Amino acid sequence: MMNLNETAARHGFCVDRVRESENLHGKMVEMHHEKTGAQLVWVDNGEDNKTFCVAFKTLPEDSTGVFHILEHSVLCGSAKYPVREPFVELMKSSMATFLNAMTFPDKTIYPVSSRNEQDFLNLTEVYLDAVFAPRILQDPNIFYQEGWHIELDENGAPLYKGVVFNEMKGAMSDVDEQIYQKTLDVLFPDNCYGWNSGGDPKHIPDLTYEQFLR
């Protein structure tokens, strides 16, 4: 581990606190980025399975599933890696021990893990480029693919489709999930925990690409 103390700085990050963590069995370094205010936590505990995670506070204001769609969309190509499905390519070629992205009621996280150092650095670079320079900003078709669009069935009747739409349609067909979401709605009527962060199929089509970009 690099020798960092509470006066150290590296790559624009300044150290705020260094402490031992019994729960994590190692040293924890808490830092902040001077220009952006981004917070960084670095844990050194001798674990050979290296883990990186970039996380964002994402507080929904409705049940359109905007952050769930965003989670999917940023992993559909970026400035440095303009392939259609970099996530799938990584799954096929990487030695990753964990590779995923998850949307919660109040945050979205993009974690990767690998025991191979070069593979770990590659995964980290791909994920950072995905979240900070995604192709979705220039290509609305990614939104329609991952969020929602309209197709015609064999009789010419319109049908809603989309990766997230279909996923949440399946999830919300479960009675337990419906009861759970209704319970949250009653318990938290005035904050983010009352909304369906994954997206309610009844409301996902309310989201436009223009609203998504905001």
Q: Model segments located where?
A:
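Acidic/histidine-enriched alpha-helical segments
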Residues: 134-166
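N- or domain-start disorder-to-order transition segments that initiate the globular core
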Residues: 2-47
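Conserved short loop/turn motifs at secondary-structure junctions
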Residues: 109-113, 145-153, 168, 200-201
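Short structured motifs
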Residues: 38-39, 94-96, 211
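M16/MPP (pitrilysin/insulinase) zinc-metallopeptidase core fold and M16-derived inactive scaffolds
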Residues: 44-129, 133, 141, 173-177, ...
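A general structural signal for short secondary-structure junctions and capping/turn motifs
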Residues: 21, 31-32, 44, 90, ...
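Histidine-acidic residue clusters that define the catalytic metal-binding segment
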Residues: 26-31, 166-214
